[in-house]
């Protein structure tokens, strides 16, 4: 599930649409889980994820891209709610923008998202740098966690 938030809002200006008319006369690949369907799914997913990042980077004044990945949630909807809560949190966004690897702001936003989760299984990372594992803070290199000033955190 890929979604973007540019300045906390979504508009038709931030939309990507893929359509198929069927006019080529090819067989429908949605009718069966064929290798062609799987290949198309992977290609469209990669394309859309790339376009989402380009749209976000193209936002007025954008100089930081925050990518939130939630794994292990009870459902896709729970994962979506947690990711949206983190990506919409003014405190989490301020920390990322200010290159402050404040895991507490991320954990807080996940906590008030609504879905229940076990804090003792919470892992938080910025890029490849783990900040928290199984609910326990870890020692980390702040510069590595913030990309060394590169302006990108995931």
PLM features per residue range, with description:
Residues 1-154:
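A structural signal for small-residue-enriched, beta-sheet-centric alpha/beta enzyme cores
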